[in-house]
Amino acid sequence: NRADIYILIKRGTNLFLERINLSVDEATEYTDGAFSIHLDRRVQLETSGLTTVPYTDSATIYIAQDGGVIPLSSVAGKLSAGEVVYAGIPFTFKYQFSEPVLKQDNKPITTAVLHLRNYAVVYDKTGFFTVKIEPLKRNTYTRTFTGRIVGGAANILNKAAIDSGTYRFGVVGHAGETDIILESDSHLPCAFQSAEWEGFYVLRSRRM
C-alpha cells in the first residue's frame, strides 16, 4: 500500500516495526458513524485476528465501535459478540495560531494596535477539542467542544457525537500578547478547515 509508512523503532532493548497509514483510516469501516480513532501504537482486536495487545504499556486504553472507552475486562465480551475493539496509547494534539496581522496593500500596518475580540473555527467530523486562550500576565482560560450540541443530529445517547460546523469563542486581548491554542487529548477525531477572527485596532499616531 503506497499510503503506508513503515518505521523501525527501538524502545529500550526491543525493536518494533510499526505502520502509519496516511490514507483513509481503516477504523471508519467499523465505528458506528464511520469516524476515525486517534491513538498512538493503535491495534485492531477481533476474534478472527489479533485478540491481545502485542506490547505492554500502562497507558493503553480500549475503544469500542461506538467510540466509548471500555475497561480491559469488557474486551473479551465485545470480541465474542463479533465486535471490533481498538487499543492504543492516547496522545495530545496541539495547534497554536500565528499572530494576526492587519495589512493594507499587502503590507502590515505598524502604526496601530490590534485588539482581538472573537474567533471562529470551522471544524469537520470532530468529536472533541479544547481552546486555550493565554493572555500575557493574565490567567489562561479554556473552552471545550464535545460534539454534543442541543438538538444536533449527532447528539445521540450512548454514541460518540461527531459533528461538523463552526465553533465561536471570545478572545479579549492584544493580538501580539495573546496565545490561542487548539488542543485534544481524546481518541475522537478533530479536523479543522479554517479560522477567522474579529477585532478592532487603534491608531497610535496620526500624520498632521
Locate predicted features.
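Beta-sheet repeat architectures centered on beta-propellers
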Residues: 1-208
